[in-house]
Amino acid sequence: MTSELPRPNGAFAVGRDTLHLVDRERKDPWVPTADREPLLSLYCPALAHTGTPAPYLAVPKAKALLTDRGQLGEHVIPERLAATRTHSRSGASPRPSAERYPLIVLSPGFTMPRASLTTLAEDLASRGYVVATVDHAYESDGTVIPGGRLLTRKACEQVFPDGSLHRVSDGRARDVPFVLDRLTGPRSAWRYSRLIDSRHIGMAGHSIGGAAASATMAADPRVDAGVNTDGTFLTPIPQGGLGARPFLMLAGDPALLPPDFPDTSWEDNWPHLDGWKRRLTVTGAGHPGFTDWPVLGDQVGYSHPETPLSGTRSQQITRAYVGDFFDRHLRGIPAPRLDGPTAADPEVVFHRR
């Protein structure tokens, strides 16, 4: 049986492109002989029934991912994971619009592929955003460059022995400004760059990608709003703040954290957020709960026993709160869900407002 991602909630069909970028002016921090080369999936509102179904993962990437996690052949084979049905279409025609769409950059967790945020990306695009998910080279289990070249993971061996994980979020805070230059600058690398409203840009990330969101905001004033989903702030927020820009902190259930994993970075960095801010936790959600993995795990009978919230419900909450946050702060659309607890979402606990 083929797995399938949840359908987007927005009004628009979704198109998807792949864009391989090379920064000729910056060497890769993990492979110094190579130029830095982010690989993007770009999602946008599209005309329905144009293009062809977009694949989820390349088989070599799926195999590398499952092998690294010790799940190869145990719960799912690479071909099944790669064949997961998405709700975006390659080669689709962009939806004509008199207005441009805000841009949102999504950065995945460490060792995770950009595909792990596909459910969120498709939903945001269906609501009227251009979304760029980013594979940061040599930081995931395998990045398949167009043409078939596989970039294997190199970063872990360099940051874990000496505890220098902040190098990852610091490096991504350099990746994203380059991506913005190539998407919104005078020499755009994307054929549909005209769709982007460069005056309204947001960034969200999972785990270390969430830490990269605040680090990028500190480095680049073009990013107007940010979201950290369950990520330790490895790169501290500057004491002077983020220029009064809004920031959402959305985390898993603290009761599910191992006792030997204290994380005070959210408390430590909260006072430095000097704009609109919220800190929320989701009861029953584990660390992967803000990605596609729990949804797909439920479908193959591999649900983590210590994370009782279903994958479907985890994604409903993630898409609702992240989407409403960007609607409010990039498009000026009221989002009462963010004002306080609601009976419709009893799992969501407001810790700070």
Model-derived regions, located:
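Active-site machinery of serine-nucleophile hydrolases
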Residues: 43-47, 57-64, 69, 115-158, ...
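Short, solvent-exposed loop/turn and secondary-structure capping segments
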Residues: 31, 51-55, 116-119, 142-146, ...
